[in-house]
Amino acid sequence: MDLKVTLIKSVAHRLPKQRKIVKALGLGKVNSTVVLPDNAATRGALLKIAHLISVEEVNK
C-alpha cells in the first residue's frame, strides 16, 4: 500500500520547518503529486503538514 500525496495549499507564509518537509517529500508547486511508501516516517511527516495536503491510499 502506498500513499498518493497532493499539495493543495501553498507553502508561502508557512513556517520554515513546514517548507522543508514539503520539499523533502518531493512536492513543489500547488497540485504537485507524489506517491510515497506507507511507513511511520512518512506518516509522521504528513501529520506535520496535514493542513497543506490531501492524502489517498493507492495499491501498488
Curated annotation (Swiss-Prot):
GO terms for cellular component: cytosolic large ribosomal subunit. InterPro entries: Ribo_uL30_ferredoxin-like_sf, Ribosomal_uL30_bac-type, Ribosomal_uL30_ferredoxin-like. It comes from the Bacteria. Pfam families: Ribosomal_L30. One of its GO terms (molecular function) is structural constituent of ribosome. One of its GO terms (biological process) is translation. Keywords: Ribonucleoprotein, Ribosomal protein. The keyword Ribosomal protein applies. Part of the 50S ribosomal subunit. Belongs to the universal ribosomal protein uL30 family. PANTHER family: LARGE RIBOSOMAL SUBUNIT PROTEIN UL30M (PTHR15892:SF2), MITOCHONDRIAL RIBOSOMAL PROTEIN L30 (PTHR15892). This is Large ribosomal subunit protein uL30. It comes from Lactobacillus gasseri (strain ATCC 33323 / DSM 20243 / BCRC 14619 / CIP 102991 / JCM 1131 / KCTC 3163 / NCIMB 11718 / NCTC 13722 / AM63). The lineage of its organism: Bacteria, Bacillati, Bacillota, Bacilli, Lactobacillales. The gene is rpmD.
